[in-house]
Amino acid sequence: MKQHPKISLIGSGNIGGTLAHLISLRELGNIVLFDVTEGVPQGKALDLMQAVTIAGSDIKIKGTNDYKDIKGSDAIIITAGLPRKPGMSRDDLISINTGIMKTVAANVKKYAPDAFVIVITNPLDVMVYVMLKESGLPHNKVIGMAGVLDSSRFNLFLAEEFKVSVSNVNSMVLGGHGDAMVPLARYSTISGVPIPDLIKMGLSSNENIEKIIDRTRNGGGEIVALLKTGSAYYAPAASAIEMLESYLKDKRQILTCAAYLQGEYGVHDLYVGVPIMIGKEGVLKVIELQLTTEEKALFDKSVEGVKKLIETIK
């Protein structure tokens, strides 16, 4: 891949702007910041260019309202769409954001058919499905940002519970990116020690871990309720950067993302949050975990929720 890959960000709101800032500071590539609102991407691009000048970076950032400017992009991150407001679920956004995603997909197909695409727009599992079907891109090049964010929330709450550094915590969250997501304590560890073992040692309790799991499921809603006029953007942007960097640098990281399943986990023709390996070809492999009967039941329930949402847009 060339020295400065071309990275296009579709949507210049809070997440789009934060993404551009993080990409420029890490010097991951030159940036095209797109939005339909005139002046917004241009203004943010100018502000960001002045910010990276202080950091001594020569990364180029262009703000635009013209899809032609995404031509030849190596990677595209999509945040365009209506954000959640208090009292709204991710699923309430479905009809408006489906229309937006279809327009974005048509332009990605036209101008950047070889790009690696990360979708952030909610409801995530449906939006990434729409992107795949409408763009015609190969499924290994289209993924959704889900589990990295959900796991980061789970990691934080577990670190607080066990009073350890977040760097010691690895957690696993499967399923749809919604209220039926499946945080897995059994596959979550503190310095390699599984959470159930730590409970047996008396360092926490099943009750406390269940509360943490519930808080993780409502992690986005908790922030929406506090902000009142928007939704989370720092953590979603940081999560997408982790995925983007694994692709651009061929790091082959195993990250939980919304991936297209073709029989894995017993699921066909759906995007669901599972661990995948991301490298220079996109999704290199889906990691299939051995789930207990109870875990599989929760996962299947989450999958059913995604299926029902997909049906509403067909």
Swiss-Prot record:
Residues at the catalytic site: H177 (proton acceptor)
GO MF entry, a single one: L-lactate dehydrogenase activity
Enzyme Commission number: 1.1.1.37
Binding site for substrate: R84, R90, N122, R153
Record-listed NAD(+) binding positions: G11, S12, G13, N14, I15, G16, D35, N97, I120, T121, N122
GO biological process, one term: tricarboxylic acid cycle
Alphabetized UniProt keyword annotations: NAD, Oxidoreductase, Tricarboxylic acid cycle
Presence of the UniProt keyword Transcription regulation in the record: no
Stored InterPro entries: L-lactate/malate_DH, Lactate/malate_DH_C, Lactate/malate_DH_N, Lactate_DH/Glyco_Ohase_4_C, Malate_DH_type3, NAD(P)-bd_dom_sf
UniProt catalytic activity: (S)-malate + NAD(+) = oxaloacetate + NADH + H(+)
Coiled coil regions in record: none
Family listed: Belongs to the LDH/MDH superfamily. MDH type 3 family.
Cross-referenced HAMAP family: Malate_dehydrog_3
Function: Catalyzes the reversible oxidation of malate to oxaloacetate.
The name this protein goes by in its record: Malate dehydrogenase
Species of origin: Rickettsia rickettsii (strain Sheila Smith)
